[in-house]
Amino acid sequence: MRYDVVIIGGGLAGLTCGIRLAEQGKRCAIVSAGQNALHFSSGALDLLSHLPDGQPVSQPLDALDELARQAPHHPYSRMGAAAVAALLPQVEALLERSNISLLGNHQQNHWRMTPLGKFRACWLSPADGVTRGLADSHFGDNPLIAGIEGFLDFQSRIVAGTLQTQGIAARSDELKLPVLDRLRQNPSEFRAVNIARLLDRPENRSALVEELSLLANGNDAIIMPACLGLDSPEIVSELADALGKPVLLLPTLPPSVLGLRLHQALSQRFRQLGGMVMPGDRAVRASLSSQEIAVHSHHHRDIPLRAKHAVLASGSFFSNGLVTQFDRVTEPVFGLDVRFAEQREGWSQQDVFAPQPYMQFGAIVDEHLHPRIAGETVNNLYAIGAVLEGFDPIVQGCGAGVSLLSALHVAEQILKEGNP
């Protein structure tokens, strides 16, 4: 099977790169092992919330020079501030073309509410999320935090209590919703995605509206767990119209409706453009030459995927894009050079809340995001997203930005080579 580009990994980075290439007529295939980090995400996208020294960032573009000084191996530093600034509007436009409704812009971080009622700096938030610092932020002065009876993945009392400490007159209550009684009988099935599949049905809408209107009498907004709007945020806006007040969603424990919705929108866009996705498959090895890369997958061992270019978007330890052994960290498909601490004692810190060194382990790349094998740069192979070295997506608040920007950066490199 022959393609222009083979992408290993079907998460945020892989899909974004594939969409951009497919928009320009490239024939792309994505080998996706299964669930990715989007299934566990809040649906919000961060760009840069903190520098490595802990300094908070409000205007990410203004912080790129200092980031390069503190973290020269950070993917943004590798790409360069000028490239990052040029790509950011393109990222936002690509997401809009993919029919993804987001609030925010790259000039200024805003704040999104976490599942515990606290606020975290953010670049782009779901249109039905709870935000602060945007013209469209509207979670009210006395919101109702509406939980769901028996649903343990969202604690409305904790959220309301946290908001009260911030001077917001929030209160909590729980929806009974008899339509969910069958799900309640099996706690392992009483999860956000399964609830959303029921609440998104038109025949269940009136019961939801009726109960919410009773609970929220006297409240100026409703904040509830993201247990509806699996396929589209329009369901949430229709509910808000019926109630006459804003209805906003907070992410729950995984699997995340907001993250799944983002993944579905990107996957649909890629397929609409003619892209091929091989779900449930896994790249196991590859052979390289200067003219072609052949990728062998678990289900197609004897029939490799051949392409002039390959893009590794396999993620970090979470998705086995990086693998640890007792004394080293490896990249299992290509055997890329990986930067990691030589002494295993330096891989982590005892304090679980402290920045963990292993989070910054990853593939060594140049400014074009070409990786190395045994010290030699491979010019028709690229690495993007969480497999890259030099950044901590949690502490620095830059995981989504690295995935999106590195994906477009590499797509542009491939397109330039095809159109000199």
UniProtKB/Swiss-Prot annotation:
Pathway: Polyol metabolism; glycerol degradation via glycerol kinase pathway; glycerone phosphate from sn-glycerol 3-phosphate (anaerobic route): step 1/1. It comes from the Bacteria. Its EC number is 1.1.5.3. It catalyses: a quinone + sn-glycerol 3-phosphate = dihydroxyacetone phosphate + a quinol. It holds the Pfam family FAD_binding_2. Belongs to the anaerobic G-3-P dehydrogenase subunit B family. Composed of a catalytic GlpA/B dimer and of membrane bound GlpC. This is Anaerobic glycerol-3-phosphate dehydrogenase subunit B. The lineage of its organism: Bacteria, Pseudomonadati, Pseudomonadota, Gammaproteobacteria, Enterobacterales. The gene is glpB.
